[in-house]
Amino acid sequence: MDWEKVGLKMGLEIHQQLDTESKLFCPCRTELTDSEPDHDIVRNLRPTQSELGKFDRAAFEEAMRKLHFHYENYHEETCLVEADEEPPHPLNPEALEIAVTIALLLNMRVVDEFHTMRKQVIDGSNTGGFQRTGLVATDGHLETPQGTVKIENLCLEEDAARRIRETGDGVVFRLDRLGIPLVEITTDPSMSDPQQLREVAYQIGQILRSTRVKRGLGTIRQDLNISIRDGARVEVKGVQDLDLIPEIVEREVKRQLSLVEIRDTLQERGAVVEDKIFDVSEVFADTESRIISSAESVLAVKLRGFDGLIGVEIQPGRRLGTEMADYAKKRGVSGIFHTDELPAYGITEEEVRGLRDAVGASQGDAVVMVAHERVTAENALREVIRRAEMAIQGVPEETRKALPDGNTQYLRPLPTSSRMYLETDIPLFRIEDDLLEGIRRNLPELPSEKKERIMRDYGLSEDLASQLVKRNLVDEFEALTEFRVDTTVIASLLAYTLRELRREGHDVDGLGLDELRDAIKLLEVGKISKDALRDIVACMADEGLAAEDAARKLNLLLLAEDEIESIIQEIVEGNLDMISERGMGAMGPLMGQAMGRLRGRADGKVVNRILREKIQERL
């Protein structure tokens, strides 16, 4: 696709948890728990006006859902601050120092004062209906093969509560994550190449890994800002796989281009969205459709000029009707029906004609209907009407969720600046020059610098060095290089062997650096071969044995040279005909036999030398 032609513009937001001892505004620990909660609280949240007297549209839409929020609390992971029953404590200086470190690594200008703001969030993930956040730095940059990318802002904020499950009338959240320090890094929306977007996400991720940040599933989240000429800005939240970024961008661009084409067709047709909702239950009084017959009521709306367009595919497997259904689902229905896909689902051709007649649909009109409890169905159809009106205008500004296949799904309207207002319970925090210079003098080594150094100092390949850096294993690697052992063997053990053993079900996470030292020491003193290292480590992990005991149990301690010679002599004596026929050509097959007999108990070079000598003696 010609990105320049479509006017593609992209930006990136990365949210990363910091690895601090306590939360941002209270002393609770920053670990997650799956134990039973010590107590629960229930809240209902409502939007408030900004300082300019405006409501944020995203917050307003959430409030319309009128959900009850249940919060699970714990003695060690939560306190009255998370419950919004106690004022926040002073800002965690450890979190601010980590945030400043990250900002300096991103070439950013750190602000003089940290002012805490409230960002309105009433989806239930914050008990007070807002998230505390503050600006740490601005005006940074990163270099990529495609050019310089500006880093606009770095903010320090609270992470949200964990969404656990939905109930009949609301949502259950766990408060252990609420308040964990988080940095939000935002680039400017100037990127026009999806590969550059991926590269920036990778670089920022590597920089974050060089500082004190949490690791593991859910500790980092990437959001994409995507727009095209004649389209709209869309925020795609929850991108987990960096390799999926180009696919997500391409599919979002396709979606917006398709919506622009639909808009043009609707405007050419003079399409009109009527707000009248019809009760068409009588049309389906004798229906054989299980979905329809089990519903309390069947309501419908006529969309003039929409015929054939609701079923238009805008992303692989998703249509304009899917977009309408996503809006309707926010009001509690499981889906919608529309005439572009009917007859289907047990609905007959005759019933479709009756439906069209009941709402007065002409040729060129479409009908959308919902089967549900009456009030819920009405609310759902109001959302369909709203989304249909947007379709006539073009592409709506939205926050969307990234799906595993690269598609995106509507979440809520794009937030506005009306969601921000000052936090009055927390004083400003001055970032003194002494603090800034102290952090600057002790900046960590960047991942790219670390990779180049271990390649240079230890003779590692780029692949091995990259794996050690990516998996944060450089410190362990350098600690093990005290032994006179090939550094490639040590690097391979850490980067590949342990990961393979973990996948096979071996409990290698229970092995510490001291246990690995003992295993490598056996290799250094010549008691085992490098080929035996994998099996010995697996045995140590599974049975809790010391390295030498594991080697002895597996019969993998190296044989003396005279013992190796005796075994090779037997192999040669048993294959004299082959040696007579092939000469030194028998070396390969006999080497295979020898290594099979001596597997793990002899160094391959020693076996090769002795076997060669024995064959030559017979020629």
Swiss-Prot record:
Belongs to the GatB/GatE family. GatE subfamily. GO terms for molecular function: aminoacyl-tRNA ligase activity; ATP binding; glutaminyl-tRNA synthase (glutamine-hydrolyzing) activity. One of its GO terms (cellular component) is cytoplasm. InterPro entries: Asn/Gln-tRNA_amidoTrfase_suB/E (IPR017959), Asn/Gln-tRNA_Trfase_suB/E_cat (IPR006075), Asn/Gln_amidotransferase (IPR018027), Asn/Gln_tRNA_amidoTrase-B-like (IPR003789), GAD-like_sf (IPR004115), GAD_dom (IPR029351), GatB_C_1 (IPR042114), GatB_Yqey_C_2 (IPR023168). It catalyses: L-glutamyl-tRNA(Gln) + L-glutamine + ATP + H2O = L-glutaminyl-tRNA(Gln) + L-glutamate + ADP + phosphate + H(+). Allows the formation of correctly charged Gln-tRNA(Gln) through the transamidation of misacylated Glu-tRNA(Gln) in organisms which lack glutaminyl-tRNA synthetase. The reaction takes place in the presence of glutamine and ATP through an activated gamma-phospho-Glu-tRNA(Gln). The GatDE system is specific for glutamate and does not act on aspartate. The lineage of its organism: Archaea, Methanobacteriati, Methanobacteriota, Methanomada group, Methanobacteria. GO terms for biological process: glutaminyl-tRNAGln biosynthesis via transamidation; translation. This is Glutamyl-tRNA(Gln) amidotransferase subunit E. PROSITE patterns: GATB. The keyword Lyase does not apply. Its EC number is 6.3.5.-. The keyword Nucleotide-binding applies. Keywords: ATP-binding, Ligase, Nucleotide-binding, Protein biosynthesis.
